[in-house]
């Protein structure tokens, strides 16, 4: 687990996390890690290849450890009892593909959002942007729900499923880039009718934001305002920033003029559609933060800095170049700001017009909102084309792009709608909008920094070292 970057110092008086040192938790972690190499991708264990007498004691250790820890989580009594039952059922099936639907339905963290409330989470699951296999994982976490955030959620940004959280400790599936705990990742016999919660680790978001942004600012010679600099030095303040960003972003997926299912979970679309949707949610957050700042909210300006810096510096150069929709969204924001004179790259230094940047950022948000509203009256292929035209006004497509050649090059001779949509998606290059020369250079310089944030948390972080 990587808690520190080379540029961040350890806080000498960091509080001890007692449950993370509890003997039962340590036994639970060890048993989970011993089970990991025995499990297949779907979470099952092949007893023709692994001796059962090797597996049974490990699962028994998990069950007894959960039972020993359960009194620390009286609010999760029904859930932890269901975990024990699901583990027993898994053993009874001969460790076939695990089914933890009963325990998933019993775990309802959104029903009790209390600041500092702790949860023990045990599920067979994959971790988004982390481990793709449904291994058994265990996480100790804390809910972040300060009164000011609860008041905003009650009165302005209703989001009953949103659960901001921080890590206390975790198994290897979270020693990755994953910053979310989502119910849809859990191994179940059938998906619930609806999901009722979603957890986002604001400490991981804040810590990697601070590390990457601090290094990017130094590399690019960017002069930033004093309040932005102090944000980068304060882990707790950055976490408060991200819980507000996440609250508004997450809510925005289901608000506005939406020509499609807001999360597009069951739809296949060209990847720029996902990129525009995520960017729309972030730019809406930025726009709301501008308004909140005018009303005196103390976190609102920090949210504006965070959206700009994370979108401009981390998103475009994180991950691979295969349908990297978040990277595309970050490039689009940079190009839009650049073409509208809100930022400049001259003499090997980046400069931002801090007065103009909010206006231009909100203008890009307005362009995407117009695209969405117009899309309600368009057939799907026409909407995809309009979105491509918006993106390609600011980002240069790959020279070999079929889409860039126009509708004449696309397979509109197909008359079956499903076949046409599939062919249009198949015509998209994996890297339809390659990195600009600016981002190619930045990627080489930041790649090591970004790699160092794998598994990062807020534990033990204080100010940025000089």
Predicted regions and their residues:
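Non-catalytic terminal regions of proteins
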Residues: 2-190, 194, 359-466
């Amino acid at each position: 687990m990587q808690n520190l970057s080379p540029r961040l110092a350890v806080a000498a008086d960091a509080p001890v996390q007692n449950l993370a040192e509890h003997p039962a938790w340590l036994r639970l972690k060890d048993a989970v890690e011993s089970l990991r190499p025995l499990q297949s991708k779907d979470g099952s264990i092949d007893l023709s290849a692994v001796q059962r007498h090797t597996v049974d004691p490990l699962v028994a250790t998990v069950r007894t450890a959960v039972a020993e820890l359960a009194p620390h989580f009286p609010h999760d009594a029904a859930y932890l009892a269901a975990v024990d039952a699901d583990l027993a059922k898994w053993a009874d099936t001969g460790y076939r593909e695990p089914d933890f639907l009963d325990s998933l339905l019993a775990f309802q963290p959104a029903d009790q959002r209390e600041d500092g409330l702790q949860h023990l989470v045990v599920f067979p699951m994959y971790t988004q942007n982390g481990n793709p296999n449904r291994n058994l994982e265990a996480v100790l976490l804390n809910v972040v729900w300060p009164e000011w955030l609860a008041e905003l959620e009650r009165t302005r940004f209703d989001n009953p499923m949103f659960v901001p959280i921080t890590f206390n400790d975790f198994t290897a599936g979270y020693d990755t880039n994953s910053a979310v705990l989502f119910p849809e990742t859990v191994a179940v016999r059938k998906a619930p009718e609806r999901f009722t919660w979603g957890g986002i680790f604001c400490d991981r978001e804040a810590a990697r934001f601070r590390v990457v942004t601090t290094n990017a600012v130094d590399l690019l010679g960017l002069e930033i305002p004093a309040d932005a600099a102090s944000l980068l030095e304060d882990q707790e303040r950055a976490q408060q920033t991200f819980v507000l960003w996440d609250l508004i972003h997450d809510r925005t997926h289901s608000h506005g003029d939406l020509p499609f299912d807001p999360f597009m979970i069951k739809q296949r679309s060209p990847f720029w559609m996902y990129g525009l949707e995520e960017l729309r949610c972030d730019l809406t957050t930025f726009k709301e933060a501008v308004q909140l700042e005018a009303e005196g909210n103390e976190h609102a300006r920090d949210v504006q800095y965070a959206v700009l810096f994370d979108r401009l510096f981390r998103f475009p150069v994180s991950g691979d170049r295969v349908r990297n929709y978040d990277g595309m969204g970050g490039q689009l924001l940079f190009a839009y700001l650049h073409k509208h004179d809100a930022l400049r790259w001259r003499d090997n230094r980046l400069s931002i017009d801090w007065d103009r940047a909010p206006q231009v950022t909100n203008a890009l948000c307005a362009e995407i909102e117009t695209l969405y509203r117009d899309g309600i009256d368009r057939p799907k292929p026409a909407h995809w084309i309009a979105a491509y035209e918006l993106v390609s006004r600011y980002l240069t497509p790959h020279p070999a792009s079929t889409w860039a050649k126009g509708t004449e090059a696309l397979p509109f001779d197909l008359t079956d709608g499903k076949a046409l949509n599939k062919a249009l998606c198949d015509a998209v290059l994996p890297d339809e909008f390659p990195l600009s020369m600016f981002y190619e250079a930045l990627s080489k310089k930041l790649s090591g920094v970004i790699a160092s944030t794998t598994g990062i948390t807020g534990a033990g972080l204080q100010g940025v070292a000089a």
